[in-house]
Regions:
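Conserved "landmark" site that anchors the functional core of diverse proteins
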Residues: 1-335
Length: 335
């Protein structure tokens, strides 16, 4: 598969390297686990590498047949200049060109492959971490003329047409947070202030972290700096300028700023679909509520994947693309 146009920020990702954080390696991995797992379920390739597309997608020419699914909340995609559905397993023939256009709802989507991308793992993962230059395509985003190879696999045509309806997130801009490790280094007034104002995501935000801009600055009881310590995903650091930073997948493994809060797992899933200049608000939840929230998410995800495996949803218009193409040619010759 050859990259004709790379898109804004397209990287190879899988579930990441969380078990190597203790050794100083950033987690990396997909920003949205739900969309990632649904995408791989549609093409019957659990835990396989995907292309994570941010805002504006790539144009890719396939040099061998495959089945693909691009999963996102809303975008336009084309195969040989013809529109095709998102969130659906599509058969792509040798020589065909897939064009993923701008994502119109949300910020990220995932292109999954029935025949896996053939990339050598580093520390049990192929996930790209651009700051350290490891994983994926030599530790960088996709570039024009890059060639990605697939592993050998007999194509299972039965999965063509697998489809799934992705529901919009409820309260997509309301981010649940729990008390952070240095919660007590801030006054109760500051705790209230954090959830009583809205924040804008700065343009200086990326996979490492989202910098936020709010009207009222958060004040520390004593100092912003602490002795460096491990950083959990979703940690909300407050540096000396009083504007919070939410640390995400490509974060460093240790840091020396006070952490007023930690974004819940569901909150991080929401953040993955937000972009610069979007507004968010926080809401405090308990650790127990966060656990229930996560268990509900897992149960729903497992149900959704089971439904896909049982072929509960099928787009009949995409089951026999070759037959449709031949029929169209015959019809053209008869006219």
């Amino acid at each position: 598969m050859k990259c004709i146009k790379p898109g804004l920020f397209t990287t190879v990702q899988d579930i990441g390297r969380s078990k190597f954080e203790k050794d100083g390696f950033s987690e990396a991995g997909v920003m949205n686990q739900y969309l990632y797992r649904i995408a791989n379920a549609l093409v019957d390739n659990e835990n396989a590498p995907v292309l994570e597309v941010t805002l504006n997608g790539p144009i890719l020419k396939f040099e061998e047949p495959n089945i693909v699914a691009f999963v996102t909340y809303a975008t336009d995609i084309q195969l040989d200049d013809q529109p095709i559905p998102v969130n659906t397993a599509i058969y792509v023939e040798k020589g065909q060109v897939l064009n993923i256009k701008s994502i119109s709802s949300g910020a990220r989507g995932y292109l999954a492959f029935h025949k896996s991308l053939n990339i050598e793992p580093i520390l049990d993962s192929v996930s790209t971490h651009t700051r350290s230059g490891i994983g994926g395509m030599n530790g960088r985003t996709l570039n024009r003329n890059d060639v990605l190879k697939f592993k050998d696999k007999t194509i299972n045509h039965d999965i063509i047409g697998n489809t799934f309806n992705i529901n919009q997130l409820e309260e997509a801009n309301v981010i649940p947070i729990m008390e952070g490790l240095q919660f007590d280094e801030f006054t109760s007034e500051t705790h209230d202030q954090l959830v009583n104002q809205s924040y804008t995501i700065s343009e200086m935000s990326d996979r490492m972290g989202y910098r936020l801009n709010g009207d009222e600055l958060l004040e520390h009881k004593h100092h912003a700096d602490i002795i460096s310590e491990p950083i959990a995903p979703g940690s909300v650091q407050v540096p000396i300028n009083g504007q919070p930073i939410i640390l995400l997948n490509d974060r460093q493994t240790i840091g020396g700023y006070t952490k007023i809060a930690t974004v819940s797992f569901i909150g991080r899933e929401k953040l993955s679909q937000l972009k610069a200049n979007d507004s968010i608000t926080f809401k405090w939840i308990s650790f127990e509520d966060a656990a229930v929230e996560y268990q509900t998410y897992i149960k729903q995800l497992e149900q959704d994947i089971d439904d896909i495996k049982l072929k509960k949803y099928k787009d009949l218009n995409n089951i026999r693309p070759k037959s449709k193409k031949i029929a169209k040619l015959i019809k053209g010759n008869q006219s």
